[in-house]
Design a protein with these regions (language model features):
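Protease-domain processing segments flanking chymotrypsin-fold serine proteases, especially trypsin-like
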Residues: 5-14, 18-49, 133
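Conserved active-site neighborhood of the chymotrypsin/trypsin-like protease fold
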Residues: 26, 30-41, 48-125, 147, ...
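Conserved PDZ fold ligand-binding element
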Residues: 51-57, 164-172, 227-250
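C-terminal cap/linker of serine protease catalytic domains
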Residues: 66, 166-215, 272, 277, ...
Length: 288
């Protein structure tokens, strides 16, 4: 039996996980061989019925004891993926099979204490609880907030397992688990975004915020960066990005993660006693 605790700082791709019939929407997560010639990637494909929901390419695959795992049947160990880019290495592989986003839990509808569930390989449904959204696990921070859930210690979902809410809507896919039953999930919104925006690249605005601050104060700016060019100043407090409210560091992460990077932005900040609006800001796109 694999020790899943170390995966808190990374992602893993399950060899093959089939969602049980207890959940009305047939859902599976399947790892397939890389498609690009010479590319050292594994691909995680989340599929609903015959329609492709998402196809994610991890940034890099780790070797365990000098042995690289090859994909096979259900007994194949999960591929552990290094979080060097703090989950920013997830990219969408274009697929002609992408048709729809499936039945997803709307963003922000979950409340602390809401019931979550997943179905085991034995068709047994295990109940858990939604804890909240987190932008870091230990010393590892991420480019978007992950869903934190709690399941029984002896019945945690495996890596790659889809989890659902009380109305059987997809909440997210498990990225990491701990021995205490704590799980972190890639939100359904992120899966849908990656599926419907395969051309999207990571967006950078060139500003620094304090990860521990409860107020989104701009602590620093990168010279020549998008916000610096737009006249944003150190000490400004973010109000919104493209009319998305920014109340804290986590809001800032999500607001930038779900940008496609191909359209100018509008940003509002508080400067002293004034509200300042900057429009036409062109973000920097990460070419990777």
């Amino acid at each position: 039996m694999m020790d899943l605790a170390p995966i808190l700082t990374g992602i893993a791709v399950a060899g093959l996980i089939c969602q049980a019939t207890a959940v009305p929407v047939p859902f599976k997560v399947e790892a397939i061989l890389p498609q690009a010639e010479g590319a050292p990637y594994a691909t995680m494909a989340a599929q609903i019925g015959k329609d492709m929901l998402a196809s994610l390419i991890p940034y890099r695959v780790l070797k365990n004891g000098g042995v690289t795992y090859h994909l096979g049947d259900k007994s194949t160990p999960p591929l552990q993926v290094w979080a060097q880019e703090k989950l920013t290495g997830l990219h969408q592989r274009s697929s002609p099979y992408i048709r729809r986003a499936g039945r997803l839990t709307p963003s922000g509808i979950l409340k602390h204490g809401d019931k979550l569930s997943f179905a085991s390989s034995k068709n047994e449904t295990t109940q858990g609880i939604y804890v909240g959204m987190e932008h870091s696990i230990g010393e590892t921070s991420f480019p978007l907030r992950l869903i934190r859930a709690q399941f029984p210690k002896l019945a945690v979902p495996p890596i790659g397992q889809p989890c659902y809410d009380s109305e059987n809507r997809l909440v997210g896919i498990v990225l990491g688990v701990s021995r205490k039953g704590t799980c972190h999930l890639l939100p359904a919104r992120a899966i849908s975004f990656l599926a419907t925006h395969p051309e999207a690249k990571r967006v950078r605005l060139g500003c620094l915020l304090d990860i521990n601050s409860s107020t989104p104060v701009i602590e620093g700016l990168i010279n020549g960066g998008p916000l610096a060019r737009a006249g944003i100043q150190t000490g400004d407090i973010l109000i919104n990005i493209n009319d998305t409210p920014i109340r804290n560091y986590g809001d800032m992460l999500d607001a930038t993660y779900y940008l496609t990077g191909d359209k100018p932005l509008s940003i509002e900040v508080i400067r002293g006693t004034q509200v300042v609006t900057s429009k036409g800001i062109l973000p920097t796109q990460d070419p990777r």
